């Protein structure tokens, strides 16, 4: 397995797909990285020679924010929204959907597991 940006990328897959295992790199950026490095997209990672792997590593290190640096930047921007008290920050703080989705029926992913309320026994007449 090749190791790029602290992530083991699979050898048996095409380079374009393998690079998407790195947080912060999708299909489009993987294609542009491979084009700049002069590596064919369809070439499997196991077929890369050392020069190609080093070229890909250098491009990712110089031009892209990945893994820990990107995650910390995202966390800092969310924290900034919460600190300034804007609507998006309040939604993050409350654990509700941020982008205007309805919350009456759905949004279970964001709210978490249902919190059931105990039924009161019906008063007997």
Curated annotation (Swiss-Prot):
The keyword tRNA-binding applies. Residues 95-125 are annotated as: Disordered. Disulfide bonds: none annotated. Keywords: Ribonucleoprotein, Ribosomal protein, RNA-binding, rRNA-binding, tRNA-binding. One of its GO terms (cellular component) is small ribosomal subunit. It holds the Pfam family Ribosomal_S13. One of its GO terms (biological process) is translation. InterPro entries: Rbsml_uS13_C (IPR027437), Ribosomal_uS13 (IPR001892), Ribosomal_uS13-like_H2TH (IPR010979), Ribosomal_uS13_bac-type (IPR019980), Ribosomal_uS13_CS (IPR018269). GO terms for molecular function: rRNA binding; structural constituent of ribosome; tRNA binding. It comes from the Bacteria. Located at the top of the head of the 30S subunit, it contacts several helices of the 16S rRNA. In the 70S ribosome it contacts the 23S rRNA (bridge B1a) and protein L5 of the 50S subunit (bridge B1b), connecting the 2 subunits; these bridges are implicated in subunit movement. Contacts the tRNAs in the A and P-sites. PANTHER family: 30S RIBOSOMAL PROTEIN S13/40S RIBOSOMAL PROTEIN S18, SMALL RIBOSOMAL SUBUNIT PROTEIN US13M. Part of the 30S ribosomal subunit. Forms a loose heterodimer with protein S19. Forms two bridges to the 50S subunit in the 70S ribosome. Belongs to the universal ribosomal protein uS13 family. This is Small ribosomal subunit protein uS13. It comes from Cytophaga hutchinsonii (strain ATCC 33406 / DSM 1761 / CIP 103989 / NBRC 15051 / NCIMB 9469 / D465).
